[in-house]
Amino acid sequence: MKMVELGKTGLKVSKTAIGTVPLQRLGFDESVRLLRECYEQGINFFDTSDNYGGSDEKVGAAFAGRDVVIATKVSTEKYDAAKASIENSLKALRVEAIALVQLHNPKQIDNGALEAVQEAKRKGYVRHIGFTTHDLKRAMAAAQSGLFDTIQYPLNFLSGEKESELISLCNSLGMGLIAMKPFAGGMITEPAYSFAYFRQRNVVPIYGIQRKSELDALIALENAPPNMEDETFRKQYEAERVRLAQQFCRGCDRCAGVCPAGIDVNYAGRIGDFFYRNPPSKYLKDDSWYNKMQYVKECTNCGKCVGVCPFGSDMRQPMKRSYEIFMQFWQRRKEYI
């Protein structure tokens, strides 16, 4: 297993790391078994959160007393709530100190949650502080603020020149850069492409898995990394990147409110993937998501959402595919609630 240093933190982590969002779909014991299998294969870096449906507890049970690097998150901007979140995570993770606590996609960089995490760090309960976001400008600002040791942002082989600037900035500052969405929320079906992308860059991807077969695929790539010098592979890599790049949504929400038809483009284009990473009941328990998704039928292809996207992503077709997936689950909702 390839090991790297996470910025200037001094933490040595596996280049192949694991994100725990999909574990929400698994039972407790099944999750613990899969996490331990990851550890047995040499993976030592695991990203969790206080709002991933019991993920902290699963990680804590899997690795109590083991030498792993755990990154969790506080999903609030309020001091008191963040303080309580850290206390809960310490108990759930069964540790005396958490290696990395990240602010979870906040709108403000300097907020009450940061104050709570800094206080916990002074008291020895947190070793390093990170920042996660889906917004590139916010990621750049957080990196330049001097307040954080790591940045977590959506990156994969579909990323472009703008994201390359974030990678260069973090490298120049000695910051650890963690990549969420290494498979673009399920869009990338050939893991070798993203694996090859990350092997060339000083970025640590967190792969979300929920099956041993997915772990086996990652380990196979560790043992036999794809060769970018291979002309056939390189051509396939570039062709797939061009085909998919314009449909990759980072989830930054810059398109909020621009759709004349009232579509929540940020979520409407991605909810199809959510069903395969989260418990379907989350979106089927009442009519709220059903009502939101009905607006997709009113899309006129005006392109206003494309015009405001910082990356020029075109989510019109992904939205329609997501609508079809949603309705398939909706018709079987009694199976999930």
Per-range role (PLM):
Residues 29, 36, 69, 76-186:
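Glycine/proline-rich, positively charged
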Residues 6, 18, 46, 59, ...:
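Conserved, mostly hydrophobic/aromatic
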Residues 10, 42, 94-97, 125, ...:
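Conserved functional loop/turn residues at catalytic and ligand-binding sites
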Residues 50-54, 74-77, 104, 133-137, ...:
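Short beta->alpha linker loops
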Residues 1-68:
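N-terminal binding-site loop/beta-alpha segment at the start of enzyme catalytic domains
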Residues 2, 34-35, 55-59, 85-89, ...:
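A general structural detector for well-ordered alpha-helical segments in enzyme core domains, enriched
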Residues 19, 49, 101-104, 132, ...:
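Conserved residues at the C-terminal ends of beta-strands
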Residues 39-40, 44, 165-179, 183-337:
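Structured C-terminal cap/extension of enzyme domains
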